[in-house]
């Protein structure tokens, strides 16, 4: 395990301390959230967490949770999630996020908006003063609109890359859409950018998670610290 993975695991272990038996839990996506899923499964097997059900935010997360024996449900059974534990690609001092590095930003945002308390787990390298400083903004678009939305993002000042998979072909999301990675640099007004993107017909969703997070657990060389919403 790398030192970065060890930090992620520490943060995940701290996050699951906020779970209680009987909860509906949102299961995040990506390597950091996977550590939390494993921790949840272990606590269930030990009998320390009972009657937990999960709502996964991506197909890979669903597969991991099923393999570990975590019961899964949909929004048809539970429209409200008690706690979601997820990672992030970047976090600012106000707990606003950039997410979508793994391409699951649409379902992740649906889960986040249905959640009473969102807990984000990151290592120290993901913290910045302004969103866009360390990570480009993922924007999910319908394939038909790839070129037009690329031009629109460029008109806003972003350098845009069409995300590719490991085979060098266009990356497809769980919903069969494309991802444009828009590098704005440090954003002075992330809210304004988010609003502009939300008005575009070809944009399915963007990776700005603004005002959804209650708690960020940060793992660093000096240990664990918590950032809470004001």
UniProtKB/Swiss-Prot annotation:
Function of the protein: Catalyzes the reversible conversion of ribose-5-phosphate to ribulose 5-phosphate.
The UniProt record lists the keyword Isomerase: yes
Binding site for substrate: 29-32, 86-89, 99-102, 126
Species the sequence originates in: Desulfatibacillum aliphaticivorans
SUPFAM superfamilies on file: D-ribose-5-phosphate isomerase (RpiA), lid domain, NagB/RpiA/CoA transferase-like
Name of the featured protein: Ribose-5-phosphate isomerase A
Known partners and oligomeric status: Homodimer.
UniProt-annotated catalytic positions: 108
CDD domains in the record: RPI_A
Broad enzyme group: isomerase
GO aspect biological process, one term: pentose-phosphate shunt, non-oxidative branch
GO molecular function: ribose-5-phosphate isomerase activity
UniProt entry keywords in alphabetical sequence: Isomerase
Pathway recorded for this protein: Carbohydrate degradation; pentose phosphate pathway; D-ribose 5-phosphate from D-ribulose 5-phosphate (non-oxidative stage): step 1/1
Gene3D superfamilies, alphabetized: 3.30.70.260, 3.40.50.1360
KW Secreted (keyword) present: no
Family: Belongs to the ribose 5-phosphate isomerase family.
Reactions catalysed, as given in the entry: aldehydo-D-ribose 5-phosphate = D-ribulose 5-phosphate
Annotated EC: 5.3.1.6
